Amino acid sequence: MYIADLHIHSRYSMATSKFLTPEYLDLWARKKGIHILGTGDFTHPLWREELKEKLEPAEPGLYKLKPRLRLAEIPSSSFDPRFIVSGEISTIYKKNGRTRKVHSLILLPGLDVADRLSEELEKIGNIHSDGRPILGLDCHDLLDMALTICPEAMYIPAHIWTPHFSVFGAFSGFDSMEECFEELTPHIHAVETGLSSDPPMNWSVPSLSRYQLISNSDAHSPSKLGREATLLNTELSYKDIYTAIQTGNGLAGTLEFFPQEGKYFMDGHRKCGVCLTPEEAVKLKGICPVCGKKLTTGVLHRVQDLAALSVPDPSGNIQTSSGKLQFDNAFSTSKTTVSIPAIRRPFESISPLPELIAAAKGLSSSSVKVSRIYETLLNELGNEFFLLREAKISDIAAVSSENIADAIACLRDGKVHWNPGFDGQFGTMELVHPFRQLNSD
């Protein structure tokens, strides 16, 4: 089983860390337990040159960091992460009388193909100023261009529910794939859930039943890698990854943010501190009750709008052929019943380990003390995904403390309460358990 994070960025993208280099990406992939990492930003000429200089071919269509460039050894993570060529493209254009703003993830089988596609994209607009270029190009035409240059290219609509920049975004997206991609829609086989939605939310939209669901971090710094990830039960090669994502054969599931932690889960207006359920926002006609400005429509609201076949279910569960999959909207007065598609895959809800340590200790996740505890756990027990998902709670307690071990146990049991995210503000976590409060030294 491989853990893959296919959507990330380089330091050439706007608002990203200077440490987004091949060396640090390799290091943090090992810390996190990520086996396959997207390169991000393949359209940027300087980044492509750096990738060619610092990576070497591995299995067909994959790369790895040259051994002499490895920054440090991590005793519990001795594997060599693989890189797959990836990039995100922002397209802004008019279609059917409206301005559309859509982000798309593209995966390619090699840097040579990235060169050819980038040459064509440079004829459309500027690919030098931002690792995630902004182009005045219809998504339909971008998909056509990618497949013409490389029929094995994977085109995946990115974070499909984000309000401002996605295929289904409330403010500048579409109501269907067909409206966006027209006759090329059959070439779309997978979608990226994004941080503010999880599989049950996507399953509630009948039109998405034919698409594979993948999840990635969209990281803008190395430490944010693996916030979400995709599980692959395949061989290591571009061809096998292609098959898994395009057909589901070898796609084992996803690791998910709790959607309430995402920064666009609920409706609201951050400046005024107003966070609302979809029902409350509808009653207010989408207007902030404090300042009178327009609310940002959240992902939950948008999902409910497109889930046309949903019906009320007093039990608060999603009905499936094999039983009940728990899904409580939590912040909505309505529940949802959906027909779960046959291609559904398992998923696990996770939260970054530094945030759990911080919640247990009453500290900021960016504090020096949290970082020190994090590194100790990694060095003594294993990578972050192993700690979150598999390590014995007793071992975690022995290396750190009882309350940190309790926090991880709460995560595994789903005993987490969220103050939900809205209008660009991430949600905050509260662990629901009888904390064994110890001295935090």
Please provide the spans of the model-predicted regions:
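Low-complexity, acidic/Ser/Thr- and charged residue-rich accessory regions of DNA metabolism proteins
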Residues: I343-D441
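Cys/His-rich short segments
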Residues: A252-T336
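An N-terminally biased module of ancient metal coordination in phosphate/nucleic-acid-related enzymes
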Residues: M1-T91, N96-T99, V416-H417, M429-L431, ...
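Extended substrate/RNA-proximal surfaces in nucleic-acid metabolism proteins
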Residues: R48-H189
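Short acidic/histidine-rich active-site segments
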Residues: R210-R227
